[in-house]
Amino acid sequence: VVTSTSIGKLFLAGIIPGILIFTMFSIYSYVYSRVKNVGVLPRASWAERWQAVKDGALVLGFPLIIVGGIYAGIFSPTEAAAAAVAYALFLEGIVYRTLTWKKVINAFLDTGIITGVVFILVGAGQAFSWFISFLRLPQEIMPQIIGADPTQLKLIIIVVIAYFVACMFVDPIVAIYVLSPIFQPYVTNLGIDMVFLGTLVTLQAAIGSATPPFGCDIFTAQLIFRRPYWEVIRHTPPYILMLILATISIIAFPGTATFLPNSALIN
């Protein structure tokens, strides 16, 4: 949104890297469970599997509405989010009949609080971005960083490191609003694909947010799973390493991020 890059193309760009990351995580989890002798769950019967399919069938409507609606040109990203909320209300209120007015009001309140926090962060990020532009810091600092003869690879590495480090300490939304206006002119001048770079930036936001000591996702996981801080971060290094390897793979083979967007009929 900040750089006017197609949301639909960014979704597509993440599919192949997502499969790569999924594969690495799966292999690591399998090896870890074998080495640590974690054990396996009892094999589910075909009846249990079919029941699980029936229970989860309606929930699969969410990715169809959000991703499918955006790809098909039916919804904008904002409209897709609203349609998903309407679908959730339909499932909970009509199909499962578990929705009450108290739950609706609490959901509205929680959403309002989260949205308010996000907008405060976005507003602060935009203000800081304007301040940086006003002081002409990009024009003063960037030439010193990228040198007199910048190349695509050099700039990509600088962008990756900058977003990775920034997202270790602040919310990714703030990092994107602050850093994007600094890098965008140089990215455009060097002809770097914005969808390719957006995929890398999104990945760095995920890595930085999960990196100790101040990654936002660490504290989120701590609150959700109610585990001590040290217990949460103790298991993150292997996954961070795999995400870094995925980043290197995408940089080495840009087609992993650009093939599907370039093949799709999405503006």
Task: Report the location of each language-model feature.
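Alpha-helical transmembrane segments of multi-pass membrane transport proteins
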Residues: 1-267
